[in-house]
């Protein structure tokens, strides 16, 4: 488990490129036949990836020992979105088939967590966010057909994008975890611009669906102290509550957003005008 400490905004603005990357960038999300796990002190979120190739991957009691409990979900909830080939997640003996861009919410108290791919040549890539939970909600699969997409932006401002809200109160109940997937239209480069912060939630982005010769300049920092981190395909970045979180790519891309904090009101954000950025 890779543990990332929280960091004050006054400290963050003094960091150079390598230090910023060390604090906020998560580079190796998917590793064949393993699960990865990155624990942030910011709202105690855990993010990572699971990519079964030659055999199934189980998250067992060994993780619980690192969290001071018996198993991962003794006091947590889990959200998973598959960005790879078809696969399945077995939760306490019940198999849930999870295709490309399908998602599964797993409530507090689940014990057995086994992840499998249907084909080794095209393995599933299960990206997950895991957050503290105070009560148990039912495990539920969410497919793209279950989500009402919202298209925002304009080709003229190069920010036309479609937002798919997978885990939000209108779709299912969770304790605090919200997740979704935003896809930029071809030829569009900007996400979340004009940008915002949200004092009551932190956020993690996973950038993917990127070509090898492309990158995203992820904008972060306080609105008057902006910095950037260069992102490659299938890398994630941690965004504290005090930080903007926006990006511009050399080509179109897709990203998964995950939020935890004290509320789940999607529009509870503090907008920042472009002319106020520094």
UniProtKB/Swiss-Prot annotation:
Question: InterPro entries under this entry?
Answer: KduI, KduI/IolB_isomerase, KduI_N, RmlC-like_jellyroll, RmlC_Cupin_sf
Where Zn(2+) binds, per the record, is at: 196, 198, 203, 245
Keywords in alphabetical order: Isomerase, Metal-binding, Zinc
The Swiss-Prot or TrEMBL record lists the needed cofactor(s) as: Zn(2+)
Listed GO molecular functions?
4-deoxy-L-threo-5-hexosulose-uronate ketol-isomerase activity; zinc ion binding
What's the stated role of this polypeptide? Catalyzes the isomerization of 5-dehydro-4-deoxy-D-glucuronate to 3-deoxy-D-glycero-2,5-hexodiulosonate.
Record's protein name: 4-deoxy-L-threo-5-hexosulose-uronate ketol-isomerase
Q: Which organism is it from?
A: Salmonella paratyphi B (strain ATCC BAA-1250 / SPB7)
Gene from which the chain derives = kduI
């Amino acid at each position: 488990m890779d543990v990332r400490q929280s960091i004050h905004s006054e400290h963050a603005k003094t960091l150079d490129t390598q230090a910023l990357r060390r604090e906020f960038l998560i580079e190796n999300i998917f590793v064949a036949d393993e699960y990865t796990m990155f624990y942030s002190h910011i709202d105690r979120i855990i993010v990572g990836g699971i990519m079964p190739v030659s055999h199934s991957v189980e998250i067992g009691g060994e993780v619980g020992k690192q969290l001071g409990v018996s198993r991962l979900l003794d006091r947590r909830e889990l959200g998973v979105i598959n960005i790879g080939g078809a696969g399945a997640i077995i939760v306490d003996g019940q198999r849930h088939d999870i295709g490309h861009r399908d998602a599964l919410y797993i409530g507090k108290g689940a014990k057995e967590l086994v992840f499998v791919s249907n084909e080794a040549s095209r393995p599933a890539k299960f990206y997950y966010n895991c957050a503290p939970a105070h009560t148990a909600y039912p495990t539920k699969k969410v497919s793209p057909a279950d989500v009402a997409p919202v298209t925002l932006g304009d080709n003229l401002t190069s920010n036309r994008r479609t937002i798919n809200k997978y885990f939000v109160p209108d779709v299912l109940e969770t304790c605090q975890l919200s997740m979704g997937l935003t896809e930029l239209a071809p030829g569009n480069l900007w996400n979340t611009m004009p940008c915002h912060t949200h004092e009551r939630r932190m956020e993690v982005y996973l950038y993917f669906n990127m070509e090898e010769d492309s990158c995203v300049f992820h904008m972060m920092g306080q609105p008057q102290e902006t910095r950037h981190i260069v992102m490659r395909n299938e890398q994630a970045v941690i965004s504290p509550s005090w930080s903007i979180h926006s990006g511009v790519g050399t080509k179109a891309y897709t990203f998964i957003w995950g939020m935890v904090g004290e509320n789940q009101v999607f529009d509870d954000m503090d907008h920042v005008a472009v002319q106020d950025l520094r």
